[in-house]
Amino acid sequence: LERINKRSFEIGYAVMHTSGQGFMMAFQAGGPHAQDRGLEAVAYGYTAMMHTPQSAVWTKPQGKHDPLVLNKTFTTVGRGIGLVIGCSTFPTWNTYPGMFADLITGNPVIVKPHPAAILPAAISVKIAQEVLSENGLPAHIVSMVIDEDGSKPGTAELATREEIKLIDFTGNTPFGNWLEANCTQAQVYTEKAGVNTVIIDSTDDY
């Protein structure tokens, strides 16, 4: 996150030129606000793991015999590979939470950006890979996959693979619903379009 923060302007311009947002919106949402969401995910993930006791002692009385005593230890284990499916309008703001939540809880992650907003995700993934390598970890703990043909997305095929255990999706409601119904091997989190229909009417009698 610190390394990403140092390249906020570069990422802001990348968001602007891919999403169509004006620079101020692209910078604030694609830069500091997105990083804030990533940091929030790290904090929540760490807090959740720390709420689980690392050890416990279980004792069972045995009447006139010595009690049975078990010293238990608990180890946090990741679920498996995470898949983060990004959207075109806010490609980092909606990618960082899932990406960093997966990482802090011990899961490798594949970032699948929207075909219209690849560059901001690519910069972020490259930074993550550099940091991982510098710390002696496999760079491809964070990976990215893009469609060879943007008009023929392979997201559904990827999302239903047995290896994928966590899915974080932002996008349209029909595909979000499809993921929830069909990706039964994974824990699926979706941020879909608005759920409430609104009718705005007017009058010529004010």
Question: What spans do the regions from the language model cover?
Answer:
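Rossmann-like NAD(P) dinucleotide-binding subdomain of oxidoreductase/dehydrogenase enzymes
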Residues: N5, T47-Y206
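N-terminal Rossmann-like NAD(P)+-binding subdomain of aldehyde/semialdehyde dehydrogenases
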Residues: L1-H65, A101, E134
